[in-house]
Design a protein with these regions (language model features):
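C-terminal "lid/loop" region of Rossmann-like NAD(P)-dependent oxidoreductases
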Residues: 43-46, 209, 214, 241-244, ...
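NAD(P)H-binding glycine-rich loop region in Rossmannoid oxidoreductase-like domains
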Residues: 51-93, 103-106
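Glycine/proline-rich active-site loop of Rossmann-fold NAD(P)-dependent oxidoreductases
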Residues: 125, 176-193, 203-207, 216, ...
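Amphipathic terminal alpha-helices
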Residues: 1-14, 35, 39, 304-325
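Conserved beta-loop-beta element that borders a ligand/cofactor-binding pocket
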Residues: 111, 116-117, 154-182, 192-194, ...
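Conserved C-terminal active-site "lid" loop/helix of NAD(P)H-dependent oxidoreductases
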Residues: 56, 60, 224, 243, ...
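Conserved Rossmann-fold NAD(P)-dependent oxidoreductase catalytic core, especially the SDR/UDP-sugar
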Residues: 98-143
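N-terminal Rossmann NAD(P)H-binding glycine-rich loop of SDR-like oxidoreductase domains
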Residues: 7, 13-33
C-alpha cells in the first residue's frame, strides 16, 4: 500500500461520504480518519437524508458545509436482485448521482469523487477491460440498468468539467469483498453468499450446496480495504476527466473461486450447479495501468489472505448479523 503522508490534502477539509455507513463506506471512513486529525467527516444517513430528493441533498450540504464529496451510496445487489429490480436500480442510482453532482456544483464543492461500476462495461469488452472501451457497446443485460445509470455520471462529470471546470473524478472498481460485506442471500454477491452457504452446510452436515450458473465465467475481486485506499489516494492526487479502473489484477473462474471458499471454510461436500440461473458477463478483468500511472496506486492484498480475513470476520460476527432468522 502507498505510504505517502496525506495530511496536507485532508487537513481542514469537510468531507461528505455518501454511503459512509455501508460496507465500503465504513472502511473508507476509518482510513480517512487515520490520514488526518483535522478532517471533518459527514455521513448523511439514509433515515435522515433521502439522496434521491433534491430538498434532502440541499439540506445535507447546508448541514455539513462540505467542500469535498466522495459518492459511494448506491442501490445495488447481486444477479438475482438486479433481475428483480431493474427499474429501481436505474432510477435510484441515476437520480441520486445526477442531483448530488449538480447540487455540489451549486454549493461550490472543490472535489467530487464518483464511484462507478464494472457493470458499466460492454458485455463483450476485450479483456482486460480498458477505460477507453467503456462506451464500446451495451452492458451485460442483467446489470445494464444499474451500469448505464452509473455510466451516465461519467458523462455528467466530463460535461461539468468542460462547462464549469467542476473538479470531479470517476473511478471504476471491480466487485469488492471483505469484512462487513452483505451476507443476506437475497441481495449478496457471490463471495459472501458462498461463504455463508458453505459454513451453514458444514455445520448442518449437508452433502452439497447449490451455486448459480455453470461456474465458467471469470471475475476479478478487490479487497475492500484496498478499494478504500485507492479511492482516497485518487481523491488526493488525481484531477482529470478520464475514468480510472480499480482492481486487483487477478482473474479467477467462479468454479475455482467456490472451490477455494469451500476449502477455506472446511466444507467437504459437493458443489451442484444450477444452470437455469444466469452466468452474467463471461469475463471480467480490469487493466489497472492507469491507476498506477495517474496516482501511484495498486492493490496489495493477496486474494486468499483477504478471503481468509472475510471468512474469519463472518464467523466471529454471524450471530449479530443474522439474529434470530
Amino acid at each position: 500500500m502507498t505510504t505517502t503522508n496525506s495530511h496536507e490534502f485532508w487537513d481542514d477539509r469537510t468531507v461528505m461520504v455518501t454511503g459512509g455507513s455501508g460496507f465500503l463506506g465504513k472502511h473508507l471512513v476509518e482510513d480517512l480518519e487515520s490520514r488526518s486529525d483535522d478532517v471533518e467527516i459527514f455521513v448523511p444517513r439514509s433515515n435522515e437524508y433521502d439522496l434521491r430528493k433534491k430538498a434532502d441533498i440541499k439540506r445535507a450540504f447546508e448541514d455539513s458545509s462540505a467542500d469535498t464529496v466522495i459518492h459511494l451510496a448506491a442501490t445495488v445487489g447481486g444477479i438475482g436482485a438486479n433481475r428483480e429490480n431493474p427499474g429501481r436500480y436505474f432510477y435510484d442510482n441515476a437520480v441520486m448521482g445526477i442531483q448530488l453532482i449538480e447540487q455540489a456544483r451549486q454549493y461550490g464543492v472543490e472535489k467530487f469523487t464518483i464511484l462507478g461500476t464494472i457493470c458499466a462495461y460492454p458485455k463483450h469488452t476485450p479483456v482486460p477491460f480498458k477505460e477507453q472501451n467503456l462506451f464500446g457497446g451495451y452492458p451485460e443485460e442483467t446489470n445494464a440498468p444499474y451500469g448505464i445509470a452509473k455510466k451516465a455520471l461519467l458523462t455528467q462529470s466530463k460535461a461539468y468539467r468542460k462547462q464549469w471546470n467542476f473538479n470531479s473524478i470517476y473511478l471504476l472498481p471491480v466487485n469488492l469483498y471483505g469484512p462487513r460485506d452483505d451476507f443476506d442471500l437475497e441481495t449478496s454477491h457471490v463471495i459472501p453468499a458462498i461463504i455463508r452457504k458453505c459454513i451453514e452446510a458444514r455445520e448442518r452436515g449437508n452433502d452439497a450446496i447449490t451455486a448459480w450458473g455453470t461456474g465458467e465465467p471469470t471475475r476479478e475481486f478487490l479487497y475492500v480495504k484496498d478499494a478504500a485506499e485507492g479511492i482516497l489516494d485518487a481523491t488526493e492526487r488525481y484531477n482529470a476527466s478520464d475514468p480510472v479502473n480499480l482492481g486487483s489484477g487477478e482473474e479467477i473462474s467462479i468454479r475455482k473461486l467456490i472451490n477455494i471458499i469451500a476449502d477455506q471454510t472446511g466444507f467437504e461436500g459437493d458443489i451442484e450447479w444450477d444452470t437455469s440461473k444466469p452466468d452474467g458477463q463471461p469475463r471480467r478483468k480490469l487493466d489497472t495501468t492507469r491507476a498506477k500511472e495517474r496516482f501511484d496506486w495498486e492493490a496489495s492484498t493477496a486474494f486468499r489472505e483477504g478471503l481468509q480475513a472475510t471468512i474469519e470476520w463472518y464467523e466471529d460476527n454471524r450471530d449479530d448479523i443474522h439474529g434470530d432468522e
